[in-house]
Amino acid sequence: MFYSRTLSDKARRYARRVPKGPRGKNIVGQRVAEARNLIEPAITQDALSGKLARLGIQLDRAAIAKIENNHRRVLDYELKALATALGVHVDWLFGDER
């Protein structure tokens, strides 16, 4: 029956049509991990989560791990907060060496 489809069925079909980035669901994950480890001393995902919380962004350790492993998309305001918390420019997270 056409009308018996659930919203989750429609959402799954839509998710399959949304193209993934060239390296997964985001293109900044590797740089987030790199920036986190370049800080002296390196900070943990939990510590980064705490810095983000102070900026008003709620990303727990698991969400940060998913971002770093390209298994989670990053919203624009999360990207800006990640750059601020890590002390890097947003362009750097995209791979720009500036």
Which sequence ranges carry the predicted segments?
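Hydrophobic packing within well-folded, soluble alpha/beta domains
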Residues: 48, 64, 82-83, 93
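Short, basic-rich loop-to-helix N-cap that marks the start of a DNA-contacting helix
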Residues: 69-84
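A short, Lys/Arg-rich alpha-helix, primarily the initiator
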Residues: 2-43, 91
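Short alpha-helical DNA-recognition segment
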Residues: 41-67
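DNA major-groove recognition helix of helix-turn-helix
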Residues: 52, 68, 78, 94-97
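Residues that mark the N-terminal boundary/hinge immediately upstream of a DNA-recognition element
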Residues: 31, 44, 49, 60, ...
